[in-house]
């Protein structure tokens, strides 16, 4: 009789565990769906705040609101689903506990009256012990909810840690002395999508001190090529070398000290104007800052600001126009006077007068051994360079001196008109 009574809680313990694991998968999946919905809501909110003017001007507010409502309903449905499965698991667990208790009492009473193989005290002890065995099982549903959310958090963290980083796979990046800064690229390919390459260049050589312009149609990969030369993007195929050393092997700090990169889209950071001008640079004096401001014309804006270099810039730099932000970024790029200057559409947001001033300043500022690579669509920018590379979706179409390339382009245009 005692063996039978002892077997009852074991059987119901196994049944409770089976039910718990059945609902575990459902709770885990619902928790993942809930977290994904929350992430999407957060992403939509940030995107809306950053583009509120575009949304207003295009009348897309209703669409954004509908998307928000849909994501909110999805998140609510996921939370309801989690609660439903959690409650179901709780109900089954409590049900098994009650059945177990009733079964032990009933079979125990029958055993006492019929065979007397156990005493009343033993029956009471068995019911107490069985309750203590099954009581922790009732906590399983809440544990499964936490388990599902924890697994998703760990999965997200793992995906972040698995993202490629600077010097991927290199334990000790190199910090060699670069007596020259010749740039070479061989068989490089890069694609933002797996099935489509944004750029495909078989061979490219830029020697120290060359002044090079990269031309091409929209979407042919000019900006992407510049980012790979800056060491910001790793080619999906091929290699980019600096002085004969693969950039992936060179310490990021050394690249930052050697290469100055001005992106096409200018971003300012929250802080003072001074902070933005010397962002990431060490040991820059006020004299260097003022000199660079005079060269770019930023000194005019600086003198109009009541706090000068201590002017607070809000997040995103929205208090400045596009042209002003571009001048600030260009000033930042030339302050360090680095050996390689990479400019992506450096005058795109400037008026004609400011553009002429900037081009003239750069022509006088660039020293003989300083390498310049500029991406542009504007003919005036070509006055700074002595070599032009024309890029297409298939790779480099034309590469030569400025006079040779411009003559070929002119000839091709005349043939096309004819």
Where are these regions (language model features)?
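Transmembrane helices of ABC transporter permease
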Residues: 1-33, 106-118, 135
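Hydrophobic alpha-helical segments in the permease module
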Residues: 13-15, 86-100, 120-142
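Loop segments that connect adjacent transmembrane helices in multi-pass transporters
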Residues: 33-81
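Cytosolic ends of transmembrane helices, especially the final helix of ABC transmembrane type-1 domains
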Residues: 37, 41, 57-60, 84, ...
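ABC ATPase nucleotide-binding domain helical subdomain, centered on the C-loop/LSGGQ "ABC signature"
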Residues: 159, 241, 249, 256, ...
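Helix-to-loop junction immediately C-terminal to a conserved catalytic motif
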Residues: 230
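A short, proline-enriched helix->beta-strand linker immediately N-terminal to the Walker B motif
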Residues: 335-339
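Catalytic Walker B motif of ABC-type/P-loop ATPase nucleotide-binding domains
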Residues: 341-345
């Amino acid at each position: 009789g005692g063996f039978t009574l002892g077997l009852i809680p074991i059987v119901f313990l196994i049944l409770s565990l089976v039910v718990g694991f059945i609902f575990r998968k459902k709770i885990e999946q619902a928790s993942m769906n809930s977290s994904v919905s929350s992430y999407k809501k957060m992403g939509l909110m940030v995107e809306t705040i950053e583009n509120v003017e575009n949304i207003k001007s295009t009348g897309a507010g209703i669409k954004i609101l509908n998307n928000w409502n849909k994501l909110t309903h999805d998140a609510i449905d996921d939370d309801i689903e989690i609660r439903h499965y959690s409650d179901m698991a709780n109900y089954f667990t409590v049900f098994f506990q009650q059945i177990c208790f009733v079964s032990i009492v009933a079979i125990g009473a029958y055993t006492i009256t019929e065979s007397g193989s156990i005493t009343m005290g033993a029956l009471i002890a068995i019911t107490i012990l069985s309750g203590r065995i099954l009581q922790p099982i009732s906590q399983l549903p809440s544990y499964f909810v936490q388990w599902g959310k924890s697994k998703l958090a760990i999965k997200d963290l793992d995906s972040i840690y698995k993202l490629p980083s600077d010097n991927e796979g290199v334990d000790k990046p190199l910090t060699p002395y670069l007596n020259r800064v010749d740039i070479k690229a061989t068989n490089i390919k890069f694609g933002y999508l797996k099935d489509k390459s944004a750029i495909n260049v078989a061979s490219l050589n830029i020697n120290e001190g060359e002044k090079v312009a990269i031309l091409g149609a929209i979407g042919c990969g000019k900006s992407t090529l510049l980012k790979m030369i800056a060491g910001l993007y790793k080619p999906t195929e091929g290699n980019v070398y600096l002085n004969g050393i693969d950039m992936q092997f060179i310490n990021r700090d050394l690249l930052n000290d050697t290469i100055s990169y001005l992106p096409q889209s200018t971003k300012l950071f929250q802080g003072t104007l001074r902070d933005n001008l010397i962002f990431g640079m060490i040991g820059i004096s006020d004299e260097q800052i003022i000199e660079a401001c005079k060269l770019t014309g930023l000194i005019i804006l600086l003198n109009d600001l009541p706090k000068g270099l201590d002017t607070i810039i809000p997040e995103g730099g929205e208090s400045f126009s596009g042209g002003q932000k571009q001048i600030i970024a260009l000033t930042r790029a030339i302050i360090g006077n680095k050996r390689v200057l990479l400019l992506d559409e450096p005058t795109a947001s400037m008026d004609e007068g400011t553009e002429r001033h900037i081009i003239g300043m750069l022509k006088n500022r660039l020293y003989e051994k300083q390498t310049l690579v500029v991406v542009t669509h504007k003919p005036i920018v070509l006055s700074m360079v002595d070599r032009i590379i024309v890029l297409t979706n298939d790779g480099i179409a034309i590469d030569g001196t400025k006079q040779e390339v411009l003559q070929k382009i002119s000839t091709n245009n005349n043939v096309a008109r004819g």
